[in-house]
Amino acid sequence: MARSKTYQMLMKISGDSSSLKKACEAASEHLDTLGNAAKAAGKVAATALAGIGTAAAGIAVAATSVYTEHEKAANSLAAATGATGKELENLQSAMETVYQNNFGESIEDAASAVSLVSRNIKGLSNQEIAGATEAAIALRDAFEYDVEESTRAAAAIRKNFGGSAEEAFGLIAAGAQNGLDYSGELIDTINEYSSQFSKLGFSADGMFQLLQSGADGTAWNLDKVGDAVKEFSIRAIDGSNTTVAAFEALGYNAATMMDTFAAGGDGANQAFFDVLNTLMDMEDQVARDALGVSLFGTMWEDLGTEAMEAMANASAGAYDTMDALEQINAIKYNDLDSAMEGVKRQAEAVLVRIGEQLAPYAKEGLEYLVNNVLPVVSSKLEEIVPVVIDAGKALWENRGTILALGSAVVTAVGAFKGLQVASAAV
């Protein structure tokens, strides 16, 4: 701190040896110390405020960026489903839930999966949509099933047998874990043959039990098991001479049997297994195969005796899903990368809320930029560009002179430095 004029005047009056001079010097030193401390404190405060400002700006930029990504995903969801108003809000909520629970490769991926679930599986609540989406993504990650295909399969199960989407996905997951996809046809078999199983009074559990029995009984293709059921469901009620003769040869009243199968339900299911077991109990293998073909078509021959016998002994109990989806989620996503991604997404949730508040101001700023700043800049550019072009042309036209002048300057500078060295040596 510079000493004051008052202090300097006192020095002149008091003289160098006076006590007043000493007192003033002591006071001045204290004032200098206080001033330096104040400056230091000011610098610290300024630095702190600058740091806070930089951090706040960084958070604002990050929040706006993340919010924009989520907004784009929501727009994609709206476009894919045609949802508006409250329905769209519910789908957006499901999308955010799925993403926050660490399912999907990105928020866009979560939006795409939610839209497929919404379109393919009707009548789900917001919570059920989120759960079904997470299940579909888990099946994709574990077994490489497309979300579109697995949701169609789950929808087929619900349509033909009832039950929740969660139960349907649980059956698919358990079936895959139990090897039902050995021929790569589990999803297609469910989609194509669920309605045929339903006609014969099967439940969803019963269908999976029969598929499992056929697969365990050396059926070389899962599709063949489904096709055998389809053929029987058609022939059992077609009233053809072949069907009538087959039922009568097995000891049944053909008309009664056809009425039973036409009615569906538990009676049809019980009759199906009764006919199948009667066939398997026949000692004459040639006659059995002939009647089997009459009722099951060529699928009887394709599947073979061992597979058909296994199907006849299929369990009537519930298909054990073993909490397959929970196991997949517990194992598949239980690693450091998944944990870190989960933390990142939790942080994103906070940034989205901040970005939502900042977005209107950012949009206003962009509108102002477009409407007020850019037109001015554009008009000025029209004035500046010709001048720059003329200057460039002048430089190019006189490039020889400029290069020669530059060379002369370099030579002169070199000579001057040489003279400096020589002078220093002398």
Task: For the regions a language model picked out, list residue spans one by one.
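Short, low-complexity N-terminal tether/leader segments at secretion or assembly junctions of large
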Residues: 1-21, 231, 296, 300, ...
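Hydrophobic, low-dielectric interface segments
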Residues: 41, 52-60, 183, 216-226, ...
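Alpha-helical coiled-coil/heptad-repeat oligomerization segments
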Residues: 171-174, 192, 210-212, 228
